[in-house]
Amino acid sequence: MKTKRVTIKDIAELAGVSKATASLVLNGRGKELRVAQETRERVLAIAREQHYQPSIHARSLRDNRSHTIGLVVPEITNYGFAVFSHELETLCREAGVQLLISCTDENPGQESVVVNNMIARQVDGLIVASCMHSDADYQKLSEQLPVVLFDRSPSDSALPLVMTDSVTPTAELISRIAPQHADEFWFLGGQPRLSPSRDRLAGFTQGLAQAGITLRPEWVINGNYHPSSGYEMFAALCARLGRPPKALFTAACGLLEGVLRYMSQHHLLDSNIHLASFDDHYLYDSLSLRIDTVQQDNRQLAWHCYDLLSQLIDGQAPEPLQRYLPATLQIRHP
């Protein structure tokens, strides 16, 4: 049986007041416009009893906003993006804003489709971890809709941006480990066209240099950020060497997931490999295999994205427009 939605008119009739009076009370303006306290309390009590919910559409028409924002990420199963999405959704919920999430699977064509779908749903703004080669489409879009980029940045973009400084903490981590492995230290990365891949390789190279070690080109192996790519790259490396590598840095926890799966399947978890990675995971504390990591602050990333976008939606000029956040090291080796 179809249920009937409770309306302001229904509340007004039950409370014995006009629809206009009920509307004022339910919209929080009753006291301001001198509706009697007894009347306000009666209207609100009936609204609670009837489980009245205000119409989002009416609210949107009233203030010309949808009170929704869109989040576009490459994949929601990625641990970092999943934690970021959770933190952002919490901020939105507390502010009375609905968060819509879409995934691109690192496909620029699919990214265009999901962004257009968000626009069609009249979101008030977008937060995007883009896989596009340039920001040209977002530059044009930003003229009519607030857009904040996060996690990665097309080259020389002037758009609002929030991301972790990958270079500095990666260099610090590698400079600590490298002196013990001067003859061999491997890097497994994602797509080189993405700024996080370039930044983390730059930090890796810088960390080696700080330890007095020159990067050998053959130490760098790139694929994509899916766990299957980490598995395949590590399998090929072990086959090439005839043994596990002595030291390895993965540019994301997804890649490390693939490495650990291969190691588990081939009984290598007790080997002497020194593992390090960008991105931390709480499960690493439970492993007998020690893993040193660079830990991003997803709560701060989400807060700064929401802060930037909220100010842009309100027509303000936030400062700074581009924000690079620090990361911390999680050292598990003695």
From Swiss-Prot:
Drop me one GO molecular function for this one: transcription cis-regulatory region binding
Where in this chain does the entry annotate a coiled-coil region?
none
Where the record annotates domain HTH lacI-type, the positions are 6-63
Q: Which UniProt keywords apply?
A: DNA-binding, Repressor, Transcription, Transcription regulation
- One biological-process term from Gene Ontology? response to fructose
Q: Which residue ranges carry the DNA-binding annotation?
A: 8-27
This molecule's function is given as:
Repressor for the scr operon. Binds D-fructose as an inducer.
NCBIfam families according to UniProt? fruct_sucro_rep
> Could you tell me what this protein is called?
Sucrose operon repressor
Gene source species: Klebsiella pneumoniae
